């Protein structure tokens, strides 16, 4: 399916946000995900289905000092 991730079009085979994060090798505990301009809470990653042409913004949390 075609997804727009952080402004870039990608062709990926994933059903849910949790699948997408696995494909992108991202840990759910260190990311924030927006799906079609709606924030998705971590506890819903396993149940939130993706559709063709969905737009996602994925932000990784990085600690520092």
Positions of the model-derived regions?
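Ubiquitin-like/PB1-type beta-grasp interaction modules and other compact soluble beta-rich domains
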Residues: 1-64
